[in-house]
Curated annotation (Swiss-Prot):
Protein name: Short neurotoxin 1
Organism lineage string: Eukaryota, Metazoa, Chordata, Craniata, Vertebrata
Location in or out of the cell: Secreted
Coiled-coil segments: none
Keyword Secreted attributed: yes
Entry GO MF terms: acetylcholine receptor inhibitor activity; ion channel regulator activity; toxin activity
PROSITE patterns: SNAKE_TOXIN
Keywords carried by this UniProt record: Acetylcholine receptor inhibiting toxin, Disulfide bond, Ion channel impairing toxin, Neurotoxin, Postsynaptic neurotoxin, Secreted, Toxin
Record-annotated disulphide pairs: C3-C22, C17-C39, C41-C52, C53-C58
Tissues where the protein occurs: Expressed by the venom gland.
Family per similarity comment: Belongs to the three-finger toxin family. Short-chain subfamily. Type I alpha-neurotoxin sub-subfamily.
Length: 60
């Protein structure tokens, strides 16, 4: 699976992953909305939104 693995403020980068899914999680803090992308589908804390998907580059 090919997933994006960058944060909201950095240039888009991709990674070839062993997992079959990609994730995009997002939350708000003093900097605004933060978006983090990567491989797999991690558990998140309350207040953090997450979107998991199972196709290449699906987590943009």
């Amino acid at each position: 699976r090919i997933c994006y693995n960058h944060q909201s403020t950095t240039r888009a980068t991709t990674k070839s992953c062993e997992e079959n899914s990609c994730y995009k999680k997002y939350w708000r803090d003093h900097r605004g909305t933060i978006i983090e992308r990567g491989c797999g589908c991690p558990k998140v804390k309350p207040g953090v939104g997450i979107h998991c998907c199972q196709s290449d580059k699906c987590n943009y």
